A protein has these predicted regions:
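ATP/NTP phosphate-donor binding region
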Residues: 1-42
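Catalytic core of DAGKc-family lipid kinases
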Residues: 3, 11-12, 21, 60-169
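Short, well-ordered alpha-helical microsegments
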Residues: 27-28, 51-52, 122
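Conserved functional loop/turn residues at catalytic and ligand-binding sites
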Residues: 38, 46, 99
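Glycine-rich beta-strand-to-loop/alpha-helix junction loops that act as flexible
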Residues: 45-47, 72
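Glycine-rich nucleotide phosphate-binding loop and flanking beta-alpha elements
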Residues: 49-51, 76, 120, 178
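Short Gly/Thr/Asp-enriched flexible loops that form oxyanion-binding sites at enzyme active sites
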Residues: 50-62
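Conserved small/polar residues in nucleotide/adenosyl-binding loops
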Residues: 170-178
Length: 178
């Protein structure tokens, strides 16, 4: 629980404050506020969407604080990629021990990302998958919603610029994970 997390962090010497998000954009605004108050670390406790919002709140700052992650979402793709414990207190232990990993930050259409960049219907699937369905069937909910939206999907034109080079594609992708 949140009180247990805060107590554990405080016993380890951290001064803590917590903020519960209620709507899209809240985590970005709170991360920006934490920057103004010169926090040494900002901890994103939530799923990949919450993490993305926090990244967007701190990405443009030259002196970013450390970013702690407590994976609490449906998929926790980025946390899994970093081999973070999937239990809350295990993730808190990683933060307390000071384990850090440098990661690249990408930017697409004025939004930042650290895990993956998606566009077109893929992002729509993520946003339109009902929370209730995710709580019932977990990550499989995204596949259900994706197959439901498949007839509406069309190929997308994509241009990628990297190190002053550009590549253009037209794709319709159905993402799968082994």
């Amino acid at each position: 629980t949140l009180p247990d997390v805060l107590i554990k962090l405080e016993r380890a010497g951290y001064e803590t404050s917590a903020y519960a998000t209620e709507r899209e954009g809240d985590a970005t605004l709170e991360a920006e506020r934490a920057l103004e108050q010169n926090y040494d670390i900002i901890i994103a406790a939530g799923g990949d969407g919450t993490l993305n919002e926090v990244v967007n709140g701190i990405a443009e700052q030259p002196n970013r604080p450390k970013l702690g992650i407590i994976p609490m979402g449906t998929v926790n793709d980025f946390g899994r990629a970093l081999h973070l414990p999937n239990d809350i207190m295990g993730a808190v232990d990683v933060i307390i021990k000071g384990h850090t990993t440098k990661v690249d930050i990408g930017k697409m259409n004025n939004r930042y990302f650290i895990n993956l960049a998606a566009g077109g219907k893929l992002t729509q699937v993520s946003y339109e998958t009902p929370s209730r369905l995710k709580s019932i069937v977990g990550p499989f909910a995204y596949y259900i919603k994706g197959f439901e939206m498949l007839p509406q999907m069309k190929a997308v034109d994509l241009r990628i610029e990297y190190d002053n080079e550009a590549v253009s594609y037209t794709h319709l992708t159905l993402p799968t994970k082994a």
